[in-house]
Amino acid sequence: MSKETFQRNKPHINIGTIGHVDHGKTTLTAAITRTLSGDGLADFRDYSSIDNTPEEKARGITINASHVEYETANRHYAHVDCPGHADYVKNMITGAAQMDGAILVVSATDGAMPQTKEHILLARQVGVPYIVVFLNKIDMISEEDAELVDLVEMELAELLEEKGYKGCPIIRGSALKALEGDAAYIEKVRELMQAVDDNIPTPEREIDKPFLMPIEDVFSISGRGTVVTGRIERGIVKVSDKVQLVGLRDTKETIVTGVEMFRKELPEGRAGENVGLLLRGIGKNDVERGMVVCLPNSVKPHTRFKCAVYVLQKEEGGRHKPFFTGYRPQFFFRTTDVTGVVTLPEGVEMVMPGDNVEFEVQLISPVALEEGMRFAIREGGRTIGAGTISKIIA
């Protein structure tokens, strides 16, 4: 049987289930595939096949995460579900699966629990833009307790709004009942997917964003000038476009006089392509790896930011000992390592391996940074943590 080609006839969205342990994230994931498989839009995946998750590496950190694919009438979804709380923290912080939106699963019998709150906070810090809530285990609530569910909903809406998620749709249902084939609860899963279709917008494609390419290498070609190479992160660059070189030194403006790929001249380079750009009036010593070349004024150099960080455990190849304010590791952004000084928040004495923490960083050189950007923290050539910029200070 020949391998099917990937049909790109629907917009693609990345989503994931988040929420407290045992509130039904994996059962819901299975119930979604069961429900949509009935419409010929998914292959049914049972609980054990999702729960038996492959390991993946993101920035040197092992994450157990299961990826499930399915479609609704309008879209193609890639859905990530993690078994353990630590895996969610790592997955969200490293951006192993960048989520365009999340389904927050909350048990109606428990309401919001510590990990519910932590996952909402993490979602905000790492820039998950939209959340749809599935209030699970509704079948366990007796009629006389029905108004408790209204209280749980109000509390959830408040909690979400506090973290900047206003007006999230809340769908009540039972993942287990839907999985067992109960028609009324299957309808609830359909309602959930309709809410996901309607409330999680299709993200802007990388190609439509302002041009940016992290520089990996610099060459000079005699008689022609300086060429910078790299993979275009977003946008499009054309011959004779004005661009800026940002980071590590003073920002410079120049003009692209040539775009090359595999030694062939092109009229333009697009997001995802590895290209060489010939730059007018730039000497080989004016530019270095780690700078970015971008649409003028679309990104600025910064040195101070707040970040959400996951610190690797010893068993994951991380540090064996805690660190304190004043710690000076290397921060790895795109194609460059820059030393930075850590300042822990008030009341936090030290950070232990395995911690999930927020702190401030002061870099010794400016780098082109943006909120929501991911980075690795290294020490002596090994990764000891991963983070996301939650706020730029200077």
From Swiss-Prot:
E.C. no: 3.6.5.3
Superkingdom, taxonomy of origin: Bacteria
Catalytic activity: GTP + H2O = GDP + phosphate + H(+)
Disulfide cross-links: none
G1: annotated span: 19-26
Location of region: G5: 174-176
Compartments reported by the entry: Cytoplasm
Gene3D superfamilies for this protein: P-loop containing nucleotide triphosphate hydrolases, Translation factors
Annotated region (G4), positions in chain: 136-139
Top EC class, one word: hydrolase
Keywords: Cytoplasm, Elongation factor, GTP-binding, Hydrolase, Magnesium, Metal-binding, Nucleotide-binding, Protein biosynthesis
Primary site of residence: cytoplasm
Limits of the tr-type G domain: 10-204
One function term, GO molecular function aspect: translation elongation factor activity
Residues that bind Mg(2+): 26
Region span, G3: 81-84
GO CC annotation terms, alphabetical: cytosol
Subunit structure: Monomer.
Function text: GTP hydrolase that promotes the GTP-dependent binding of aminoacyl-tRNA to the A-site of ribosomes during protein biosynthesis.
Family indicated by similarity: Belongs to the TRAFAC class translation factor GTPase superfamily. Classic translation factor GTPase family. EF-Tu/EF-1A subfamily.
Name of the featured protein: Elongation factor Tu
